[in-house]
């Protein structure tokens, strides 16, 4: 955070004093009188810069709605601005296919540099067929919704029996191969497959 000017520091201290003594913040006019600013637009300019620095929060619809933010408040605001809440949808297997459940169970915060569109969701993995790719039983895969995939992509795929599974995708002559990342398991060979999304990340709780 950049250093405050003496005027901005005076404004912060006056707001803090008024809230402490009176229980509510001062008006723009009162702030101007206290720090020697005759122009309300100049006061508004200082308040806007303080808000941009994360030191205050204002409600433009109310004349006295100026709130001083603590370090915790500023951290929370920055956190809220830098995350996107994505839906956690049902469960998907990394072993044998299971029916895909599309009901949203909850929403989970992810960094906005991962969630670059509104087509991202999470699924909980059940099974061990992707362990060699670092996807373990109980993990959550982060999935970008798309209906095409390149050979070698890890995807969530819907089989011919309308069941969803996480596998590595390969399009081969006359069929599709959904390849597990576990040497003890056989691939799933299908004539038709529907891609539900590409796995772009994994979230794991360490117990």
Swiss-Prot record:
The keyword Thylakoid does not apply. Residues 28-48 bind DNA. One of its GO terms (biological process) is proteolysis. Homodimer. The record marks 94-95 as: Cleavage. It catalyses: Hydrolysis of Ala-|-Gly bond in repressor LexA. Belongs to the peptidase S24 family. It comes from the Bacteria. Its EC number is 3.4.21.88. The active site is at 129 (for autocatalytic cleavage activity), 167 (for autocatalytic cleavage activity). Represses a number of genes involved in the response to DNA damage (SOS response), including recA and lexA. In the presence of single-stranded DNA, RecA interacts with LexA causing an autocatalytic cleavage which disrupts the DNA-binding part of LexA, leading to derepression of the SOS regulon and eventually DNA repair. This is LexA repressor. InterPro entries: ArsR-like_HTH, LexA, LexA-like, LexA/Signal_pep-like_sf, LexA_DNA-bd_dom, LexA_repressor, Peptidase_S24_LexA, Peptidase_S24_S26A/B/C. It is an enzyme of class 3 (hydrolase). GO terms for molecular function: DNA binding; serine-type endopeptidase activity. The keyword DNA-binding applies. Keywords: Autocatalytic cleavage, DNA damage, DNA repair, DNA replication, DNA-binding, Hydrolase, Repressor, SOS response, Transcription, Transcription regulation. NCBIfam families: lexA (TIGR00498).
């Amino acid at each position: 955070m950049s250093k405050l000017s003496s005027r901005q520091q005076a404004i912060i201290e006056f707001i803090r004093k008024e809230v402490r003594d009176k229980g509510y913040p001062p008006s723009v006019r009162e702030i101007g009188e206290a720090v020697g600013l005759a122009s309300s637009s100049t006061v508004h300019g200082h308040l806007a810069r303080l808000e941009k620095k994360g030191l205050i929060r204002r409600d433009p619809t109310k004349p006295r709605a100026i709130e001083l933010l603590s370090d915790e408040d500023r951290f929370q605001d920055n956190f809220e601005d830098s995350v996107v809440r994505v839906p956690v949808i049902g469960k998907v297997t990394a072993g044998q296919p299971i029916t895909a459940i599309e009901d949203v169970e909850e929403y989970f915060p992810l960094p906005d540099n991962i969630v670059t569109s509104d087509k991202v969701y999470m699924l909980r993995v059940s099974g061990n067929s992707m362990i060699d790719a670092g996807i373990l039983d109980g993990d959550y895969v982060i999935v970008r919704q798309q209906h095409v995939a390149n050979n070698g992509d890890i995807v969530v795929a819907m089989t011919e029996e309308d069941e969803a599974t996480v596998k590595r995708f390969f399009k081969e002559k006359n069929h599709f191969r959904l390849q597990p990342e576990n040497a003890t398991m056989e691939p799933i060979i299908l004539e038709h497959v529907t891609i539900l999304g590409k796995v772009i990340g994994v979230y794991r709780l360490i117990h």
